[in-house]
UniProtKB/Swiss-Prot annotation:
The keyword Protein transport applies. Interacts with the clathrin adapter GGA2, and VPS27. InterPro entries: ENTH (IPR013809), ENTH_VHS (IPR008942). Residues 338-361 have a biased composition (Low complexity). The modification N-acetylserine is found at S2. This is Epsin-3. Residues 249-263, 399-408 have a biased composition (Basic and acidic residues).
Length: 408
């Protein structure tokens, strides 16, 4: 077909269509704005449902939603009364998007409801004397009532989903193929809660969270599962069936690992239990000093139940007590010896008592230490020094009658 034939067969409406496309390029309109302009043209027929459905998909995108809403409001404010068809079509498109579009779009429309209220006083009388503004006023009144009632919005959106499901859900007994359109547009509620109450309660008693409808049994996920019957429910790889014979080997290995871990824990517990059960055995009958291994007088020398005492008691005769030191370097020993020699005759009874006391230093020290059995063994040398000092003072008193060493 030649260009002349194409121009000859072109109607006035086709010329307007190409002219609008040229305007979109000149004024740098986006694709979504061009679709809105196409749906709100000045033709005597309404926009197609396919075009309005494509526009409703754009309400789920933030940028396209702003473009759609701004272009619709421009139709309200920039058009004259003679272009009442474009205003009426813009109101019709807005009503469709509220019922089928995103819930965020409803919130944005409510924020700009004052621009819609301006059209409540719209008037236009054509050349034939007919008031064409009554159609616009009626549509504006119904739209404001819809935006003011949340329950009505939920009911209308539910009805729109059911209607769309009848005509779009299934064709020829099989699930429809996924097209370029958004499957969520007007059929399921979004997860984002907006300002409107309808956004918060749109899914109550209407559809489930997985996209299924509770009343009529429609489930988007179920239809996808039935379309591919070969793909059944796959079990995870780590799942082990303990009741089947095939999984006996891995189950035995798991049981052996658990038993091994339990044995290790029991071994750790046994070590601590042995440590706690080792209660020290005390023997009050024989209180041994680590530095003095000789038992207390009057008590029979019995071996202790502790193993380290047995090794020390075997050499009691060989070990000399650390408390009583028989030989010690004393600068005044010569003076004591001369004093004892001179006073040996008159003080024989006292000297004999002193010799008896000196001959048995262990008994004196043990009797003195019997009162301090609960003290620490580290201070045993201090007690021994005190006993030896008492012996020296006794010897000084015995010889004080003849010679006073302090008088020098």
């Amino acid at each position: 077909m030649s260009l002349e034939d194409t121009l000859a067969n072109m109607s006035l409406y086709d010329a307007k269509k190409y002219f609008r496309k040229a305007q979109n390029v000149v004024f740098n309109y986006t694709e979504m704005e061009g679709k809105v302009r196409e749906a709100t043209n000045n033709e005597p027929w309404g926009a197609s449902s396919t075009l309005m459905d494509q526009i409703s998909q754009g309400t789920y995108n933030f940028r396209e939603r702003e473009e759609i809403l701004s272009m619709i409001f421009r139709r309200f404010t920039e058009k004259a009364g003679s272009e009442w068809r474009q205003i009426y079509k813009a109101l019709q498109l807005l009503d469709y998007l509220i019922k089928h579009g995103s819930e965020r779009f409803i919130d944005d429309t409510r924020n700009s409801i004052n621009l819609i209220r301006i059209l409540e006083t719209f008037h236009y009388i054509d050349s034939q004397g007919r008031d064409q503004g009554i159609n616009v006023r009626t549509r504006v009144k119904a739209l404001i009532e819809l935006l003011s009632d949340d329950n009505k919005i939920r009911a209308e959106r539910k009805k729109a989903r059911e209607t769309a499901k009848k005509y779009k859900g299934v064709a020829g007994g099989s699930a429809s193929a996924d097209g370029s359109l958004n499957s969520k547009a007007g059929f399921t509620s979004t997860k984002v809660h907006g300002i409107s109450v309808s956004a918060d309660f749109d899914s109550d008693n209407e559809d489930n969270e997985d996209g299924s409808f509770s009343q009529n049994g429609y489930n988007d996920n179920a239809s996808r599962a039935t379309s591919t019957p070969g793909q059944g429910k796959q079990e995870p790889e780590d799942f082990v069936d303990f009741f089947s014979s095939e999984s006996s080997k891995p189950s035995k290995e798991l049981i052996q690992e658990d038993e091994k871990k339990a044995d290790e824990e029991e071994d750790d517990d046994d070590e601590f239990s042995e440590f706690q059960s080792a209660v020290p055995v005390t023997n009050p009958a024989n209180s041994f000093n680590l530095l003095n291994t000789s038992p207390i007088e009057g008590m029979p020398a019995t071996t202790s139940s502790m193993p380290f005492y047995n090794s020390s008691t075997t050499d009691q005769g060989k070990i000399t007590p650390a408390i009583a030191e028989p030989k010690k370097v004393d600068p005044f020993s010569s003076l004591f010896s001369t004093a004892k020699a001179s006073a040996e005759a008159p003080s024989a009874p006292k000297a004999s008592q002193a010799k008896a006391a000196a001959s048995n230093p262990v008994s004196n020290s043990t009797t003195a230490l019997s009162t301090d059995q609960d003290d620490d063994d580290e201070f045993g040398e201090m007690h021994g020094g005190a006993v030896q000092q008492e012996q020296n003072t006794n010897n000084n008193h015995t010889s004080s009658k003849e010679i006073d060493l302090l008088s020098f």
